[in-house]
């Protein structure tokens, strides 16, 4: 009989560090966001904010797209929104842009918006409840899904 190898306990100095859970990360991310309900998100967009739909293509095809949103899937988000990155979208003009991130249910968008804030994009936030809440509120959705924007030329890691 063999004994399973145990993983080393993460330490900070002499103290053991309990690894964070995904719920801990979500609470921390949301603590720095001025999250918007769908109606407030629409008002923000009408006032100049940029709405980003980070849902994967299969979800957009199944449910439709948010009218007027830029489609940037989650794995490209930071590169597209960082105004210093050669792979940025045209809307990424400076660090003062208000980015409103929308995923399907409002979970990954919170983590994504916090990541944008870590890049110095302090006005980044997300939609409470995501696309599901947007659609339930009767806000504009396009069907069938429109094609994604082509990616700008430039390097991408």
Summary of predicted features, one role per range:
Residues 1-50, 57-99, 107-157:
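Rhodanese-like catalytic fold shared by cysteine-dependent sulfurtransferases
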């Amino acid at each position: 009989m063999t004994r399973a190898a145990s993983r080393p306990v993460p330490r900070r100095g002499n103290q053991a560090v309990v690894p964070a859970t995904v719920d801990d990360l979500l609470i921390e991310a949301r603590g720095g966001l001025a999250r918007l309900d769908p109606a407030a998100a629409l008002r923000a967009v009408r006032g100049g904010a940029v709405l980003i739909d980070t849902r994967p293509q299969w979800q957009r095809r199944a449910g439709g797209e948010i009218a007027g949103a830029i489609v940037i899937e989650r794995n490209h988000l930071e590169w597209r929104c960082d105004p210093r990155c050669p792979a940025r979208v045209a809307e990424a003009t400076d660090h003062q842009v208000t980015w409103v991130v929308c995923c399907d249910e409002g979970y990954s968008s919170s983590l994504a918006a916090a990541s944008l804030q870590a890049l110095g994009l302090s006005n980044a936030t997300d939609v409470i409840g995501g696309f599901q809440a947007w659609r339930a509120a009767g806000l504009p959705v396009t069907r069938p899904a429109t094609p994604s924007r082509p990616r700008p030329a430039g390097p991408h890691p």
